[in-house]
Design a protein with these regions (language model features):
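Short, basic/aromatic-rich helical patch in the C-terminal catalytic core of site-specific tyrosine
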Residues: 30, 140-142
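Short, surface-exposed loop/helix-turn segments at secondary-structure junctions
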Residues: 124-131
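Residues that define the transmembrane beta-barrel architecture of outer-membrane proteins
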Residues: 24-26, 84-88, 134-138, 184-188
Length: 196
């Protein structure tokens, strides 16, 4: 398992590659879908994942221990970064056969889907300041689709404009402060496609 980490020396902006000697990731996923003829379909999935370092003796110190007497820490047994215990998605689509510009094999459709994930660590060495709370997102799309010929649809990602973090990370210089990568705000778009 490889993790990009920061040095503990103040003023050094460069990271280094550190190898955790042994990690373990266990999980299970359930998924299902159902279609009612050609007009309605739903799907869903949920997963449970547990990941932890079995042995990582030379890990960087967490953010709150930066500047202390130790440059490295044994975090064996701690959880792995970026892994939510629970995550999943659910969605559905309603579609009706339709003609569009002479095409008779297409459908008008409206589809919605949502995803969620629970809280997770954003740091290679677990830190109480670098945990990201769980969140859910909703997406919507509607339009006309066809296996051949012209298709178009309008869409929105993060329809409810949920504020969330994708990542929290120690800022440059290792002075104990941190920065964030913000998740995308609500966006809208139009997709045009032509299949031969």
């Amino acid at each position: 398992y490889k993790a990009q980490v920061q040095t503990a020396e103040v003023g050094v902006n460069r990271g280094y590659l550190s190898n955790a000697e042994k990690v373990r990731v266990l999980g299970v996923e359930f998924e299902g879908s159902y279609s009612f003829k050609e007009y309605f379909s739903i799907y869903g999935n949920v997963s449970y994942t547990d990941g932890k370092y079995l042995k990582f003796t030379n890990a960087p110190v967490p953010l709150e221990e930066t500047g202390g007497e130790k440059a490295f820490k044994d975090i064996s047994g701690a959880r792995l970064p970026g892994i939510s215990k629970w995550s999943g998605a659910v969605g559905g689509e309603v579609a009706f056969p339709a003609k569009f510009f002479g095409q008779s094999n297409g459908k008008y459709f409206v589809a919605v889907d949502g995803t969620f994930r629970t809280e997770f660590s954003s740091s290679s060495s677990p830190s109480k300041y670098l945990n990201i709370g769980g969140y859910g997102l909703m997406n919507l799309r509607a339009g006309y689709k066809s296996p051949k010929g012209f298709s178009f649809y309008v869409w929105s990602r993060n329809l409810l404009n949920k504020n969330y973090f994708e990542q929290l990370l120690p800022a440059a210089g290792n002075a104990g402060h941190y920065a964030a990568v913000l998740g995308d705000q609500r966006t809208f778009g139009l997709t045009l496609r032509y299949n031969y």
